[in-house]
Structure formats: C-alpha cells, structure tokens
C-alpha cells in the first residue's frame, strides 16, 4: 500500500508570536498529542517538533491527513475556530517535498538565525520521543539517521555555521552591542540559557549573575563558568541591579510583566 510522508508546519514565517505561543507544545504535551494522533489516525511514523519558533507534525500514512492534523492540534490546544488558524500553517503532502523540508529544518536553513546549532538537538529529542512512543518505523529511523549524518557533514566539511549560528550567540551579540561592560543577569539555565552564558564568558564578560528554579543546576553552571549565583527568591533584587536581563524560561504565562518591571 502506498503511503505519503506529510507535514503541517506553523512557523515564524507565516504566524505571529501570539499565534505560535497558543499552539506551541511542551515536551509533555507533544507526547500526549502523539498518542492522540495514534488513536485517531492510521500512521506508521510520527514526529512532532515544537520550539518557540515552530510547531510541526510529520506523519507517514496511506491517506492525506494534513487538514485533520491541524484541526486535531487546535482542538488539543483548546482552540475551536480552526478556520481562523488554518492560513497560518504550511502544508507539504508530497513525500519528496516533506523530506526536503525536514532536511532544511534540521540543518537550520529555516531558522530565524540561519544555521542555528540548537536545532539538531531539538530534532534529536523529537525523534527520541517518537521512538519511545513506538511511533518511529523503519522509514523514520532511516530518514533521521540520514539527516544526522548530513548534519555532521555540514558541520565538518563546510563553513555554513561559522559566525552567529544560534539564537544564544545572537542574543549575546545584541547584549554586548547595547551596553559597554554590562552587568548581565541570565534567568533560566536550560540549553539556551547555558549557551548564552558560555558565549558571554567566552567574549570576556566578567559580571554575570545566573539564577534558575533548580538550585543544583545554578551551582553547577556557576562552578563551571565562574558566574555569581542569585537565589530564585532574590530575582527582582538582581534585576534591579542589572543592565541587561536575558531570560530563557519555558512557561505558559510571562515571567516578566510590565507591572513587575515597573515595581523594581
């Protein structure tokens, strides 16, 4: 039986931030959504990629599922008016086009910072989630390993990722262009937060404070990079003394509001 590898894609290229925020999936939500797709549709492979700039659902199926996938995703996120949101999505229903699109996404060609080095890790985590859920068949396994091999060749054999090849590098670049010898506070020490910290240290910034909801992670990063630890409870005090605050916290609601900043 013939099958089609297809994708529905919501990205910064067509959707504003307010829309992307509503539809973005946390890691736990992505896992739950994959099980929903499995329950509703006959798919042999399923991959869900969701970051701050994109939410994409790839499936391999014997029938076209793109419109149904979008509707299911919107319902899953509590959005009932699918007609309003359909124009924000890009759809690829041809297997060759979908494969090419995934290759381009995985190598960072479609990232806001072209060549973003964090994208391959995001794709790997999405693939691991598919494998853990028994939703990666022979086709997806072979495709993903081919993509990882291609990514390795890009990194080793080309200069594609030279320069500001990540959001974290671009953030540190912007910070240093705004203030001379800034006092910087980094809030959140996930992959991006740690990368920002490393980039700033590598570029000679000496006054860096860091804080994280998990104390252990803060101490580990501080010990590795020589940054000053700020207790999470003292976040507002540290903000008031900082020239620049860089946040990479994953939350459903904003951590920093206009009202909170006004009270500093």
PLM-predicted stretches and their roles:
Residues 1-111:
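A glycine-rich (often HGG/GG-containing) alpha/beta subdomain
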Residues 147, 163-168, 172-201, 205, ...:
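Glycine-rich adenosine-cofactor-binding loop
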Residues 45, 207, 226-228:
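Conserved beta-strand segments of alpha/beta enzyme cores
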Residues 84-180:
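Glycine/serine-rich phosphate-binding loop and adjoining beta1-alpha1 elements at the start
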Residues 14, 20-32, 173, 195-198, ...:
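N-terminal loops that bind phosphate or other acidic moieties
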Residues 28, 32, 64, 68, ...:
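Conserved active-site and cofactor/substrate-binding residues in soluble primary-metabolism enzymes
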Residues 222-264:
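Rossmann-like adenosine-cofactor binding region
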């Amino acid at each position: 039986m013939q099958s089609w590898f297809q994708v529905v894609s919501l990205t910064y290229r067509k959707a504003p931030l307010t829309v992307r925020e509503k539809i973005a999936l946390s890691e736990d939500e992505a896992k739950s959504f994959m099980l929903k797709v499995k329950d509703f549709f006959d798919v042999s492979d399923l991959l869900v990629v969701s970051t701050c700039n994109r939410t994409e659902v790839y499936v391999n199926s014997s029938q076209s599922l793109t419109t149904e996938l979008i509707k299911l995703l919107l319902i899953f996120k509590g959005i009932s008016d699918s007609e309003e949101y359909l124009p924000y999505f890009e759809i690829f229903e041809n297997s060759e086009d979908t494969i090419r699109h995934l290759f381009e996404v995985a190598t960072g060609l479609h990232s806001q910072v072209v060549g973003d080095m964090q994208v391959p890790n995001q794709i790997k985590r999405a693939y691991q989630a598919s494998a853990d859920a028994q939703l990666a068949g022979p086709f997806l396994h072979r495709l993903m390993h081919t993509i990882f091999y291609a990514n390795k060749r890009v990194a080793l054999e080309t200069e594609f990722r030279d320069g500001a090849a990540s959001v974290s590098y671009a953030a540190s670049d912007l910070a240093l262009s705004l203030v001379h010898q800034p006092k910087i506070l980094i809030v959140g020490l996930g992959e991006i937060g740690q990368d920002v910290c490393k980039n700033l240290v590598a570029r000679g910034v000496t006054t860096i404070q860091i804080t994280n909801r998990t104390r252990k992670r803060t101490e580990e990063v501080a010990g590795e990079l020589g940054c000053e630890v700020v207790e999470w409870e003292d976040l507002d005090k540290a903000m008031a003394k900082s020239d620049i605050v860089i946040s990479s916290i994953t939350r459903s609601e904003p951590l920093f509001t206009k009202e909170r900043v006004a009270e500093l």
